[in-house]
Amino acid sequence: HLGVMNVFHLPLAVNVQRIDQLRQTKKVIGLKQKKYDISFVGSLYENNYYEQITYLPAHLKGYLDGICRAQMQLSGVDILPELLREDILTELNAYVKLDMDQTYLVTYGRLFSDLFLKKYISSMERKERLELLGKISRIALFSGSRWMGEGIGYYGTVDYMNEMPLVFSLSKMNLNMTIRSITSGIPLRCMDILGAGGLLFSNYQPELEEYFVTEREWIS
């Protein structure tokens, strides 16, 4: 496609030397006593576009809600392209206009799925999993999304370069909940956690198994 003959890929990287120096300076390397039981650093996408659409017909809204719920049950596979049939997209296009010109290399369905549905699914998934875990353990939420629930403590945002690695080091377990637009690759957050010496608890991503040993280097 587009005249490209070869594509080479490497997973994202992390500057372990810089982070180790930071952890050493802050005296968090090798600490047996952790400050947080389970931590999550990230957005809850509570202002996602899909939930702002309040004018869809009931049958269309019901169908989209249903396929979002179905997708939420599956990790490492994207079923939305198959379920967003042409008749559904044609009707949807009458209500939701996307500013697309000929320079766009994606379809209307793909753009709507990535911008609207997948952030909505990620929002539902993150809130539901945090609520579930909050019933059995203490959760430390570091986010711009101010959200409270049983067992969940809100700590605001953290600086990516200097504060976030310390959170991962000071947590017994660190959650990664991959945004649904990343179907198979390793999210940067996984590398952030592992690079800071934290225990990674993540949803399944095919590429994680290609580079790391499950239940030894990360848990799912």
What are these language model-derived features?
Residues H1-Q102:
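Catalytic core of nucleotide-activated saccharide and alditol-phosphate transferases
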Residues L2, L132-I136, A196:
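Alpha-helical structural signal in soluble globular domains
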Residues G3, L10-L12, Y120, L141-S220:
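Catalytic binding pocket for nucleotide-activated donors in carbohydrate/polymer assembly enzymes
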Residues K27-K32, E125-G134, P165-V167:
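A general structural signal for short secondary-structure junctions and capping/turn motifs
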Residues Y36-F40, S137-A140, M173-N174:
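Hydrophobic beta-strand segments of well-ordered beta-sheets in folded domains
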Residues Y49-H59, D114-I121, Y154:
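Short, flexible/disordered intra-domain loops and linkers
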Residues L89-I136:
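Alpha-helix-centered segments that form part of catalytic cores
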